[in-house]
């Protein structure tokens, strides 16, 4: 009895079997759109993601503002810790300091915030940058409200206090602007 020989193997060409390729890609989850509307060309790019999607498109001047903020917070913190009388005198024009402890505590808090600002300067993570900008905006807003309340209580309106209030409003506006700019969704390229 003669053994039956198997039929010759037929090679499939990918150009001729498009339906098979489509089914394979669908099973692998490749080629379709994800939630963000991106089309992945391979499973690897789908798993790893597209790094353009995660890169922060920084608004013009953001890093300069972060640097200025870090220097500002550090400088005022050191001045409040080392020279509390002079800092109080510069803001409130000759009003007598009753205790240096609250001013030094203020300096310690500012020094802590400045460390966060310095670390945020070197990160590329969008969430961290936004949180530090929000922290700045909240700090400057609270400082504006506290100084305004003190001004209303004491009635001492000096040029230093008015300059401080105007600068705090400007700093709030800049921080909020960058906060929203960093949070914007990037445009599709």
UniProtKB/Swiss-Prot annotation:
Location(s), subcellular? Membrane
Q: Which UniProt keywords apply?
A: Membrane, Phosphoprotein, Transmembrane, Transmembrane helix
Which ranges make up the Extracellular topological domains here?
Answer: 85-108, 152-159
Main localisation: membrane
Q: Which organism does this sequence originate in?
A: Bos taurus
| Keyword DNA-binding recorded | no
Asked if the record carries the keyword Transmembrane, the reply is yes
User: Entry's InterPro entries?
Assistant: TP53I11 (IPR028266)
TM annotation in the entry: 64-84, 109-129, 131-151, 160-180
**Which regions face the Cytoplasmic side of the membrane?**
1-63, 130, 181-189
Its name, as the record gives it, is Tumor protein p53-inducible protein 11
């Amino acid at each position: 009895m003669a053994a039956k020989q198997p039929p010759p193997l037929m090679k499939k060409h990918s150009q001729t079997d498009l339906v098979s390729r489509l089914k394979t890609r669908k099973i692998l989850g490749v080629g379709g759109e994800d939630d963000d509307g991106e089309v992945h060309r391979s499973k690897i790019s789908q798993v790893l993601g597209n790094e353009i999607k995660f890169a922060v498109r920084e608004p013009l001047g953001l890093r300069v503002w972060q640097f200025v903020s870090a220097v500002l917070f550090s400088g005022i913190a050191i001045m409040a810790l080392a020279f509390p009388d002079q800092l109080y005198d510069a803001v409130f024009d000759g009003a007598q300091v009753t205790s240096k402890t609250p001013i030094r505590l203020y300096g310690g808090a500012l020094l802590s915030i400045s460390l966060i600002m310095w670390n945020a300067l070197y990160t590329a993570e969008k969430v961290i940058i936004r949180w530090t900008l929000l922290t700045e905006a909240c700090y400057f807003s609270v400082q504006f409200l506290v100084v305004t309340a003190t001004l209303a209580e004491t009635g001492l309106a000096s040029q230093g206090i008015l300059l401080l209030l105007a600068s705090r409003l400007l700093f709030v506006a800049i921080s909020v602007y960058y906060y929203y700019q960093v949070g914007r969704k990037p445009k599709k390229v």
